Amino acid sequence: MTSFCGSSNTLAASAPQPEKFTNTHIEYKTTWRDMWKVTKAYFRDNRDAATPTFDIPVSALTPQMLDAVAEDSVIKLGHSTTLLKLAERYILIDPVFSERASPVQWMGPKRFHQAPISLEDLPKLDAVIISHDHYDHLDKGSIEILKNKVDVFITPLKVGNHLRDWGVDANKVVELNWWQSTKVSDIEIVATPSQHFSGRGLFDRDETLWASWVI
């Protein structure tokens, strides 16, 4: 189901930490002091600095409206959550529908508005693509609801471990390294390099891969 496309420019594990992924160019260097500052700000949820000063326009989206779209479309559902309708196929990217992008729902960054369509009203999805495992891109609650209405989940290397832990059928998970590709019907999806990092806690930094995508 997967293949290498073009010349390989894959990630190499760093020598002193062979279980971690690295960027090909500039590395992010953070100290424990940096991590503490970020974590403190994350959980305190500094609304004064982050809250928009104007209302964000949100147009409700219904299943009937999606069905009526005759041409290829890109529909932004909030933050990085994006629904693609391509050749009558539905592909959802980085689904985050929970109230907060956080390991718990009683604290952490809170969304500014509800998604224009609910998880339950989404059509059957041909694929879900995940870019990396940060909480604002990989949402456990959303995955648990979506897992039975998605044909395939496409992730960077080792991100699939989260999905399988949350009950997604292992046969539905495709993990790709940079420059590997897979197909959904006639649509080719290629994992490409990105400059970032990964992790969902204090001690799992860069243990999963991150990627941009060409579709």
Where are these regions (language model features)?
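Loop-centered beta-sheet repeat module
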Residues: F153-P156, N161-W166
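Catalytic core of the metallo-beta-lactamase
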Residues: K85, K183-I215
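Helix-loop-beta element that forms the nucleotide-linked donor phosphate-binding surface
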Residues: L163-N177
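Structural motif
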Residues: R89-I91, A127, I187
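Divalent metal-coordination and catalytic microenvironments
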Residues: L84, D94, H132, F153, ...
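Active-site metal-binding motif and surrounding structural segment of the metallo-beta-lactamase
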Residues: E27, D34, M107-I154
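Metallo-beta-lactamase
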Residues: M1-K110, A115-D121, I215
